[in-house]
């Protein structure tokens, strides 16, 4: 297994170009199964999960090529089962189910894998498809969906806000007969991006970005060209990297309006931030950040995917900060690892109390999930001495060339190939 060796401390400064959003690219790739004509998707990040998704689409019979953009022709799809060997590594594969049953009347997906963060069940996906008229069976570790004729539009009130289930229902409803209304829908920018992609193909969707999405079903979707929005979590991660190292950064190909809650907290921490149409700059003027209180919640509140990075920020900030996690359970697995580097923190229920210290010390630490692992790499950049981050396959699932981008900012980081 590969590791990162990071030598610190360094002040990170310079420019970074932000990649396309993983959390938009994945649902968009699966939504391409709905299209009867070729689709070109631009700004798709080069990530393990993206490669797995493309491989899965190929196994279903789609023609998939990558030459800068990703080209998908799903006109010849003739396999309707997403097998365990691919699905086990990635939760996003559940997104194949809605398009398959909507367009072909049948679909099977093995129960998914991915990061082990708390209870992330597929119940809401299943309930939503059932309300659209699909028959669902759970057999031999597979979710099997089928429908006679077309799915039927429905008024769906979601029990809780779920990005994944909103995507599944919205995709399936595009080809349903009649109108579907999703109440208590997720409002994330990646939901908006997926909806806008579907509209490019001929879907009729309104209300994306609000908690009420209306989809008027159409008989078929055509092809089109679409550009994935910039990754707000990658952007936030690099902004935090500069903030904790008392540095200065310019993020290009960013989308500032997707990061309001994060930018507000960085300003509270003492960062000088400016934004343009497609860029964000942060300057700490050599100062140590101030501790901030953060509470995660669905968009437009503070994103859970930035929680680990802000936990780290608080652990090296002036003062004491409280981080409360309301979205996922069991999402403080990075805290014991950061404690190995000298961090002072206590976990009380769903809150971590961070007591800021001046400097961390290098140590051997282990990545446990995608965002937690990013916080450990950043910690290594500012810690005294050498930090070894193990199990970095988690990082490769969500960050494109993170070591190259950090190196360009002055970090002393190298990938050590595993046995």
Curated annotation (Swiss-Prot):
Positions bound to UDP-N-acetyl-alpha-D-glucosamine: 91, 120-124, 160-163, 305, 327
Bilayer-crossing regions: none
Entry GO terms, CC: cytoplasm
Reactions this protein catalyses: phosphoenolpyruvate + UDP-N-acetyl-alpha-D-glucosamine = UDP-N-acetyl-3-O-(1-carboxyvinyl)-alpha-D-glucosamine + phosphate
Catalytic residues, chain numbering: 115 (proton donor)
Compartmental location: Cytoplasm
Residues that bear 2-(S-cysteinyl)pyruvic acid O-phosphothioketal: 115
Keyword terms of this UniProt record: Cell cycle, Cell division, Cell shape, Cell wall biogenesis/degradation, Cytoplasm, Peptidoglycan synthesis, Pyruvate, Transferase
Pfam families with a match to the protein in the record: EPSP_synthase
A GO MF term: UDP-N-acetylglucosamine 1-carboxyvinyltransferase activity
Residues that, per the record, bind phosphoenolpyruvate: 22-23
Lineage: superkingdom: Bacteria
SUPFAM superfamilies named in the record: EPT/RTPC-like (SSF55205)
Any GO BP: regulation of cell shape
UniProt-listed HAMAP family: MurA
PANTHER family in the record: UDP-N-ACETYLGLUCOSAMINE 1-CARBOXYVINYLTRANSFERASE
Role according to the record: Cell wall formation. Adds enolpyruvyl to UDP-N-acetylglucosamine.
Family: Belongs to the EPSP synthase family. MurA subfamily.
Entry protein name: UDP-N-acetylglucosamine 1-carboxyvinyltransferase
Upper lineage: Bacteria, Pseudomonadati, Pseudomonadota, Gammaproteobacteria, Enterobacterales
Gene expressing this chain: murA
């Amino acid at each position: 297994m590969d590791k990162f060796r990071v030598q610190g401390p360094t002040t990170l400064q310079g420019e970074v170009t932000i990649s396309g959003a993983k959390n938009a690219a994945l649902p968009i790739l699966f939504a391409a199964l709905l299209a009867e004509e070729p689709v070109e998707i631009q700004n798709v990040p080069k990530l393990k999960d993206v490669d797995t998704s493309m491989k899965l689409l190929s196994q279903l019979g789609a023609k998939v090529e990558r030459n800068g953009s990703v080209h998908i022709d799903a006109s010849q799809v003739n396999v309707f089962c997403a097998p365990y060997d691919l699905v086990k590594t990635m939760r996003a594969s559940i997104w194949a189910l809605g398009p398959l049953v909507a367009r072909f009347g049948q679909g099977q997906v093995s129960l998914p894998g991915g990061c082990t963060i708390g209870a992330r069940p597929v119940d809401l996906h299943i309930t939503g498809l059932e309300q659209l008229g699909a028959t669902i069976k759970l057999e031999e570790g597979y979710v099997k969906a089928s429908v006679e004729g077309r799915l039927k539009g429905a008024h769906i009130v979601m029990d809780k806000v779920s990005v994944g289930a909103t995507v599944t229902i919205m995709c399936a409803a595009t080809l349903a007969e009649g109108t579907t209304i999703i109440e208590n829908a997720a409002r994330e920018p990646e939901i908006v991006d997926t909806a806008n992609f579907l509209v490019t193909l001929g879907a009729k969707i309104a209300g994306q970005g609000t908690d009420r999405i209306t989809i008027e079903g159409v008989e078929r979707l055509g092809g089109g060209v679409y550009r994935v929005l910039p990754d707000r979590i990658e952007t936030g991660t690099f902004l935090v990297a500069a903030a904790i190292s008392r540095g200065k950064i310019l993020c290009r190909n960013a989308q500032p309006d997707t990061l309001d809650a994060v930018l507000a907290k960085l300003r509270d921490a003492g960062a000088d931030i400016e934004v343009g149409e497609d860029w964000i700059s942060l300057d700490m003027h050599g100062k140590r950040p101030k501790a901030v209180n953060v509470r995660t919640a669905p968009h437009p509140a503070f994103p859970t995917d930035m929680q680990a990075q802000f936990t780290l920020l608080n652990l090296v900030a002036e003062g004491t900060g409280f981080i409360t996690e309301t979205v996922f359970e069991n999402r403080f697995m990075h805290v014991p690892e950061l404690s190995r580097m000298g961090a002072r923190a206590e976990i009380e229920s769903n809150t971590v109390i961070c007591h800021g210290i001046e400097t961390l010390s290098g140590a051997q630490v282990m990545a446990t999930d995608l965002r937690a692992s990013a916080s450990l790499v950043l910690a290594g950049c500012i810690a005294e001495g050498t930090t070894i981050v193990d199990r970095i396959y988690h990082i490769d699932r969500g960050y494109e060339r993170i070591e190259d981008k950090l190196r360009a900012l002055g970090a002393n980081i190298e990938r050590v190939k595993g046995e």
